[in-house]
Design a protein with these regions (language model features):
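Conserved beta-strand -> loop -> alpha-helix junction used to position metal-binding or nucleic-acid-contacting
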Residues: 61-87
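Short, surface-exposed amphipathic charged segments that create phosphate/polyanion-binding patches used
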Residues: 80-91, 108-116
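RNase H-like, metal-dependent nuclease domains and their acidic two-metal-ion catalytic environment used
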Residues: 1-71, 96-156
Length: 156
């Protein structure tokens, strides 16, 4: 979850898990409702489209509004990550280590994000890929030019 202030994106919460969809869907719905997220992009490769539809239905059933887009990614993941890394470094702000619990989704996310190597050999690239999808979503919906305060997110 990114709270947006102008062109600054504060990453305040994440859902970072390898759990199956029966566990992940309700967790994501709760996260959307708890944070009042209003825009989300879900990668629709490998069943993500159905996942996105289910999350959208569950959020709507709670009478909440969140634009949930399902979009496939076709470009090379490593190339996309490297292309957006400068934008992420410039615009994204993360919680300090003492602001999240050790062993939490946020902790695992930060470890995965900060251990990514641009030379390759990355077994676990979900965290940088998630941030890349956030950057692409921001570009897609044009938030960089918009100074409204919003909350946007990305999920896999």
């Amino acid at each position: 979850i990114a709270k947006v202030f102008g062109t600054k994106y504060f990453i305040t919460d994440v859902l970072f898990t390898k759990d199956n969809v029966e566990i992940t869907e309700p967790k994501l719905v709760s996260l959307i409702l708890d944070t009042r997220c209003d825009n989300m992009r879900i990668e629709s490769n490998n069943g993500g489209r159905i996942f996105a539809l289910n999350v959208r239905k569950a959020v709507k059933a709670k009478n909440e509004k969140c634009i949930i887009q399902a979009k496939p990614t076709t470009a090379n993941k490593e190339t996309r990550i490297l292309l957006k890394s400068g934008w992420i470094k410039k615009h994204c702000y993360f919680l300090a280590e003492g602001e999240y619990k050790k062993g939490s989704d946020y902790d695992r996310f930060m470890k995965a994000l900060t251990s990514y190597k641009k030379e390759g050999g990355n077994k676990h690239d979900d965290a940088p890929d998630g941030m890349t999808i956030l950057a692409e979503n921001v570009e897609f919906i044009g938030l960089c030019q918009n100074n409204r305060t919003r909350q946007v997110a990305r999920a896999r």
